[in-house]
């Protein structure tokens, strides 16, 4: 097997692993709970598809490029977590709300 075929197989295994980490939601719950689970699942699925596309289309590092640079570029590929909303309003907004 050539190195190109091995690299393609490695990328496909990685993409397959990504797909396995996000199973379709099932289980009990109210209609709203099931709907929210499906919505979150679709959002994660879209992120996985985008990540898989980037992995598949990521160019092979040139021979003269250091391996560390290629690793750093691959480490930037990640599924983003949605941030939690802030517990309180920032100071400038509090001041504006208090003085009409």
UniProtKB/Swiss-Prot annotation:
Name the UniProt key words of this record, in alphabetical order.
Answer: Host cytoplasm, Host nucleus, mRNA transport, RNA-binding, Transport
Entry keyword RNA-binding? yes
Signal peptide per UniProt: none
User: Where's it found, cell-wise?
Assistant: Host nucleus, Host nucleolus; Host cytoplasm
* Database matches in Pfam families: REV
Q: Which InterPro entries match?
A: REV_protein (IPR000625)
Motif Nuclear export signal, chain ranges = 67-79
**Domain of life where this protein originates:** Viruses
Instruction: Kindly list the biological process annotations in GO that this record carries.
Output: mRNA transport
Q: Which GO terms describe its molecular function?
A: DNA-binding transcription factor activity; RNA binding
Motif range for Nuclear localization signal and RNA-binding (RRE)?
Answer: 30-46
Q: What is its main location?
A: host cell
Q: Which GO terms describe its cellular component?
A: host cell cytoplasm; host cell nucleolus
Query: What are the start and end residues of every segment in region (Homomultimerization)?
Result: 14-22
Where is the stretch described as Disordered? 18-39, 80-100
What does the protein in this record do? Escorts unspliced or incompletely spliced viral pre-mRNAs (late transcripts) out of the nucleus of infected cells. These pre-mRNAs carry a recognition sequence called Rev responsive element (RRE) located in the env gene, that is not present in fully spliced viral mRNAs (early transcripts). This function is essential since most viral proteins are translated from unspliced or partially spliced pre-mRNAs which cannot exit the nucleus by the pathway used by fully processed cellular mRNAs.
Free-text comment on this protein's domains from its UniProt entry: The RNA-binding motif binds to the RRE, a stem-and-loop structure present in incompletely spliced viral pre-mRNAs. This region also contains the NLS which mediates nuclear localization. These overlapping functions prevent Rev bound to RRE from undesirable return to the nucleus. When Rev binds the RRE, the NLS becomes masked while the NES remains accessible.
Partners and quaternary state? Answer: Homomultimer; when bound to the RRE. Multimeric assembly is essential for activity.
The name this protein goes by in its record? Protein Rev
């Amino acid at each position: 097997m050539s190195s190109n075929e091995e690299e393609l197989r490695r990328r496909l295994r990685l993409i397959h692993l990504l797909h396995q980490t996000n199973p379709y939601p099932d289980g009990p719950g109210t209609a709203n709970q099931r709907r929210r689970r499906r919505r979150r699942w679709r959002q994660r699925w879209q992120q996985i598809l985008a990540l898989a596309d980037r992995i598949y289309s990521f160019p092979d590092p040139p021979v003269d490029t250091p391996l560390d640079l290629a690793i750093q570029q691959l480490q930037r590929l990640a599924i983003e977590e949605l941030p939690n909303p802030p517990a309180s309003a920032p100071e400038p907004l509090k001041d504006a709300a208090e003085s009409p």
